[in-house]
């Protein structure tokens, strides 16, 4: 009993230290959260498995540490996605890997539900993304449409929109048909 207690405390402490390090990152810094989430996910896999192997997946100790880890990985993904620049067209896919892993390791119902909710939001965003090879053109077209919507209703603005988007649409057609 005492030996298993000591054996489990070390990986739990390792996980808690990694969680604290990820929490200390500026929540508004997208790239810092991407890095922190990746490091947190990769650096704790072995320790989490050790805890599960020692005390079992149904143990309260394991459930608490797994849920805390899932919540922080989830938060890194949320912070990254919410603060990623518009130029980062892959942000939904990158954040989704965090949400998927957090959902996989979460145990408690509240944590699982929160992970599932965020996973579903990103899944919808990923499903609605243009193919990667035309993401830049798609973004430029959206920007042209945004500018157009702010203009008064005049034929000249419509012509400008058409002239600015025609080469982009032709490029998209050439790339994906």
Language-model-detected regions and their locations in the chain:
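Amphipathic alpha-helical segments of tetratricopeptide repeats
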Residues: 52-53, 100-104
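Amphipathic alpha-helical repeat scaffolds of TPR domains
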Residues: 1-49, 62-86, 97-100, 109-177
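Short linear interaction motifs
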Residues: 55-61
